Amino acid sequence: MNRYILFFIFLTGSVGGITAQQAKIDSSYANWYYQQRMAYFEKLPTIQRAVIFLGNSITERAEWQELLADYRYPVLNRGIGGDNSFGILARIDDVVRNKPRAVFLMDGINDQFRKLPHEVSIQNYRRIVRKIKMKSPRTKIYIQSALPINEMITTEDYTRGRNELVPELNKKLSQLAKEEDVVFIDLCPLFQDDEGRLSKEYTVDGVHLIPTAYIKWVKLLKDKKYL
């Protein structure tokens, strides 16, 4: 009997160990590029009441200042290629230190690439939103949807099976926005095809947008009176 008990303990302990390994969360973010961008931001002039676009490479690649050259408030790009919700959370105090007029937040796809559970991403988003509210109460907060990808174009293994997770993440982001009383902006209809993939019309690599796609993005923000 004791042998069976010991075997059961060994078996359940092993299964528990496997589960714990599978549930391990990758919260890293401060790679060399992240650190370089942060060092660059620290050296820029202080600008009060700006509109800030905050996110990963999809945000960073846009020429927001030129796209909004006629806008009545300063516009700042605070995108960092490869960033994720942990990285944005870590730098949000710096982002809102100068009391921005508005923050347009987009993240999510890099969380999916590293297979973070949606619950972890949403928790980070919630903490980001609440920090903005606490540090800069007058700042308007806009949560923008994660964009789909096109796995028929992408060549990286880490993108496989990720696109099917985007709709559920966006559903949770929309719910979060309601709970936190901030605005959710669904960008997916602008850029996805009939199959829910990032349209070939707007991407070359299956993940990032071509430059002209940002013109359409800004037009939506203006049409909706967010800008």
Language model feature labels by segment:
Residues 22, 148-227:
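Catalytic His-Asp segment of secreted/periplasmic serine-dependent ester chemistry enzymes
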Residues 57-61, 81-85, 109-114, 147-151, ...:
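Solvent-exposed loop/turn segments at secondary-structure junctions
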Residues 118-128, 166-169:
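Charged helix-capping and loop-helix junction motifs
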Residues 20-102:
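Serine-esterase "nucleophile elbow" of acetyl-processing enzymes
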Residues 1-23:
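Bacterial Sec-dependent N-terminal signal peptides
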Residues 99-108, 137:
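Proline-aspartate-enriched helix->loop->beta-strand connector
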Residues 77-80, 109-121, 156-162:
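Surface-exposed cleft-lining segments at the edges of enzyme active sites
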